[in-house]
Amino acid sequence: MSGTNLDGNDEFDEQLRMQELYGDGKDGDTQTDAGGEPDSLGQQPTDTPYEWDLDKKAWFPKITEDFIATYQANYGFSNDGASSSTANVEDVHARTAEEPPQEKAPEPTDPRKKGEKRKAESGWFHVEEDRNTNVYVSGLPPDITVDEFIQLMSKFGIIMRDPQTEEFKVKLYKDNQGNLKGDGLCCYLKRESVELALKLLDEDEIRGYKLHVEVAKFQLKGEYDASKKKKKCKDYKKKLSMQQKQLDWRPERRAGPSRMRHERVVIIKNMFHPMDFEDDPLVLNEIREDLRVECSKFGQIRKLLLFDRHPDGVASVSFRDPEEADYCIQTLDGRWFGGRQITAQAWDGTTDYQVEETSREREERLRGWEAFLNAPEANRGLRRSDSVSASERAGPSRARHFSEHPSTSKMNAQETATGMAFEEPIDEKKFEKTEDGGEFEEGASENNAKESSPEKEAEEGCPGKESEEGCPKRGFEGSCSQKESEEGNPLRGSEEGSPKKESKKKTLRNDCEENGFAKESEDDPNKESEEEVGPTKESEEDDSEKESDEDCSEKQSEDGSEREFEENGLEKDLDEEGSEKELHENVLDKELEENDSENSEFEDDGSEKVLDEEGSEREFDEDSDEKEEEEDTYEKVFDDESNEKEDEEYADEKGLEAADKKEEEGDADEKLFEESDDKEDEDADGKEVEDADEKLFEDDDSNEKLFDEEEDSNEKLFDDSDERGTLGGFGSVEEGPLSTGSSFILSSDDDDDI
């Protein structure tokens, strides 16, 4: 064998030639060797000839004619598909015909014995009975249609569909002219449907025609042509999915024109502006939630998007059905949301409303975020408060309600601010009075009281007057709140009966004496000249008023009640000096008559009403008074009757026109004085009187604004008494110039009026 590369045929021929030259003797020896039995190839296992392949560098069995025949018999060989190499082998066999025939192995005549696969013979097919789902129906009316036949046969089972055309597998046979013959074929999906149709539909009648149903049998008509290409259904998966779809319980879609998928998406514009989210990014979530709540009324929402960077303020809402989207468009188009008129329309299916953030915007956003992180904690809190206030100042855009008027939020904000303004002055007044009471406890001297009087006027008088004159409702609300808190205090009576009463009595006496000395130097002998009150007199009167206020504030800080201080002082005076109290009561009657006369000039009927109410309240309280103090009360009543006459003469000298009301006021005053002795153990009654007094002087303030400068001093005194209304009864007794010892009567008068 040469070392050149030969192709397969040349190489095979070369091997045959070499076999002729060198292999005849060996073959003869192998065949004539009787010592061993031949194997299946006709050769001894140990006598198999090998040859060396120079190209592959290996030994291979030597190819002989017997080897080729055996190989063809084992691995299948047909005469029609003989290869050229086999032809060459035949040529070699012709050339070696002189060899004995026994050397040739017999060629196999039956290929099946050698392991060749048997191919299925092409011919007519037969359907197995257990898999046959076809039903043949005869006796149908000649005018029956395919739809009517489908409707008839579908009553007994699911009709199979063609996987490619998706049409029902039914057939109505026709003759040569195209007319219906009256028979048809139906293919069911399950075998059970065939049995059901045989039981129920067989021998049934339709329009007078009797039907006959049987299992379909397929027969060959004519001769079978095997040359025709056999139809193959390779779409097994498609067929299986079609069957599963038919077996599904879900109903089929409604027949009708199908709408596009993008018609289910609604585009809403002008919902917001991108700048709205810079101050408060959380507004985005609020708008999304409001839109979700509103759109859920029209149907099921599948998806909701807000394009926060779009300049038109675009939002998209995806519904389940196009009809729901149509309803949403019809309802929301043209409505108002957050002060903006929105528009709603169906999505065209192509427009992309997503606006990407530019590199510049991204850099600015990152810089702002970095600045926020580097800022101290205090500035962060300030920025948060600024953002909250900015969101409150946003106005109509923050309403975020459909079809809402833009000014609603502003009105609500104004109401809130007004309510806060009403409450703030009241709290400030209480706080200042408490501070003043604490300062007065440190030093109860007259000089200290006078020094602190300008400060107290600035703190108490000015804010109280401004709040009461500018907004009367505010003072009324404040007094009501104080009344409620005082009336609801059950601890006041127990505190008054405590051992602290002795020390408080002494303190009150010292204060009253100091006030009396100060008032003697400040009194003006000309009592009738009320119009000529000088600035010195006004300042002195203010000082005396402030001293009484400080006495009341001292009592408030000590006991938490506004009447206990003065009542304790009154009790001390009655116990220690009976005659001195009678003198003070006479002067008190005069002062009360002055109040009555001036009230009559001002045409203030509120005082009468309040005094009557006080009388009725005190009548109820008299039933619960202790019997041990009745004697003192009777003595006081007789003294008051004698003092009433003196008060009347004093009022006539001043030219006041209150004679018609003196008797009524005197009766009310008698009741007031009778109660003063009994109120030592019942301070709860004083709280109710205090509430009535506050209402009285608030009415006086509203009436005093209408008069001349002649009554300005009285107005000021009345306003001061209003400021002290929560602290001490009838503060109006300090009007005008007072007689000697009037400052002492101020404090005792407040006690008697309780």
Swiss-Prot record:
Gene3D superfamilies: 3.30.70.330
Residue numbers spanned by region Mediates interaction with the P-TEFb complex: 381-754
Phosphoserine modified-residue sites: 387, 403, 407, 409, 445, 452-453, 481, 485, 494, 498, 521, 529, 557, 561, 579, 597, 600, 607, 616, 624, 642, 676, 702, 713, 721, 748
Positions with biased composition (Acidic residues): 539-552, 564-579, 591-606, 613-633, 640-651, 675-713
Gene Ontology BP term (one): double-strand break repair via homologous recombination
Residue intervals of the RRM domain: 133-218, 264-349
Highest taxon listed in the record's lineage: Eukaryota
Region Disordered, annotated ranges: 1-53, 81-122, 380-415, 433-754
List of residues that carry N-acetylserine: S2
N6-acetyllysine: residues carrying this PTM: K297
Compositional bias annotation for Basic and acidic residues: 90-122, 462-476, 508-538, 553-563, 580-590, 652-674, 714-725
Residues recorded with modification Phosphothreonine: T633
GO cellular component: nucleoplasm; site of double-strand break; U2 snRNP; U2-type spliceosomal complex
GO MF annotation terms: chromatin-protein adaptor activity; poly-ADP-D-ribose modification-dependent protein binding; RNA binding
PTM comment: Phosphorylation at Ser-748 by CK2 during S-phase in response to DNA damage promotes interaction with TOPBP1 and double-strand break (DSB) repair via homologous recombination.
Glycyl lysine isopeptide (Lys-Gly) (interchain with G-Cter in SUMO2) crosslink location in chain: K429, K430
Region called U2AF homology motif (UHM), residue ranges: 259-353
Ranges annotated as biased composition (Polar residues): 405-415
PANTHER family with a match to the protein in the record: HIV TAT-SPECIFIC FACTOR 1 (PTHR15608:SF0), SPLICING FACTOR U2AF-ASSOCIATED PROTEIN 2 (PTHR15608)
This protein's domain notes: The RRM domains mediate interaction with U snRNPs. The RRM domains specifically bind poly-ADP-ribosylated RPA1.
Functional summary from the UniProt entry: Component of the 17S U2 SnRNP complex of the spliceosome, a large ribonucleoprotein complex that removes introns from transcribed pre-mRNAs. The 17S U2 SnRNP complex (1) directly participates in early spliceosome assembly and (2) mediates recognition of the intron branch site during pre-mRNA splicing by promoting the selection of the pre-mRNA branch-site adenosine, the nucleophile for the first step of splicing. Within the 17S U2 SnRNP complex, HTATSF1 is required to stabilize the branchpoint-interacting stem loop.
UniProt-recorded name of the protein: 17S U2 SnRNP complex component HTATSF1
Origin species: Pongo abelii (Sumatran orangutan)
Gene: HTATSF1
